[in-house]
From Swiss-Prot:
Family that this chain belongs to: Belongs to the aldehyde dehydrogenase family.
Protein's name according to its UniProt entry: Benzaldehyde dehydrogenase [NAD(+)] I
Top-rank EC class of the record's enzyme: oxidoreductase
Swiss-Prot/TrEMBL GO biological process terms: catabolic process
Oligomeric and partner information: Homotetramer.
Catalysed reaction equations from the record: benzaldehyde + NAD(+) + H2O = benzoate + NADH + 2 H(+)
Cysteine disulfide partners in this protein: none
Domain of life: Bacteria
Native source species: Acinetobacter guillouiae
Lineage of the species this protein comes from: Bacteria, Pseudomonadati, Pseudomonadota, Gammaproteobacteria, Moraxellales
Entry keyword set: Aromatic hydrocarbons catabolism, NAD, Oxidoreductase
EC code: 1.2.1.28
GO molecular function, one term: benzaldehyde dehydrogenase (NAD+) activity
Amino acid sequence: PNIQTKIIEQIWKEHIFQGTVVK
């Protein structure tokens, strides 16, 4: 049940990391 949440959190972290790196 928490698998989807973990995946979303990972994607969110990756997205933020990429955005920070790009900026």
